[in-house]
């Protein structure tokens, strides 16, 4: 009876050791990934809190039956914004826009150009930055 008790205790100890090894081997990388994701989330929230944009002027010129828009956007926050990730909506429809610069640094202005836009009359314009902060402008000719 003494040998079987020692053998069963050894088997249980080895099984427990293997179970702990499997659990920690799978759990530690997951916890590291969660920690990294949480750090990225904090950085993104911090960037959103420090991002402010303002549409300063909008001008429109006729291009045949369509219109070209020139929109100036000022970065009034403290985060540098990447303009290639901006979205420009005219009356709720996204249009491709080109910008005069790759980045809008704090307290600087970027100039966006939209060509061949079909909407005339009063126009609602929305600019969305790369981290989701937006500004609205109502253009009336």
What is the predicted function of each stretch?
Residues 10-39:
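C-terminal juxtamembrane segment of a hydrophobic transmembrane alpha-helix
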Residues 29-141:
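N-terminal export/assembly leader peptides and their processing motifs that target proteins to secretory
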């Amino acid at each position: 009876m003494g040998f079987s008790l020692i053998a069963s205790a050894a088997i249980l100890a080895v099984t427990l050791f293997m179970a702990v090894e499997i659990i920690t081997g799978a759990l530690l990388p997951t916890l590291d990934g969660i920690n990294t994701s949480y750090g990225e989330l904090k950085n993104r929230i911090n960037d959103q809190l420090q991002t402010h944009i303002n549409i300063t002027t909008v001008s429109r010129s006729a291009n045949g039956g369509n219109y070209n828009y020139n929109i100036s956007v000022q970065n009034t926050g403290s985060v540098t914004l990447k303009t290639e990730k901006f979205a420009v909506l005219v009356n709720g429809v996204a249009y491709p826009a080109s910008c005069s610069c790759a980045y809008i640094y704090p307290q600087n202005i970027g100039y966006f150009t939209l060509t061949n836009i079909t909407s005339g009359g009063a126009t609602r314009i929305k600019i969305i930055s790369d981290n989701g902060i937006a500004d609205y402008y109502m253009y009336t000719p």
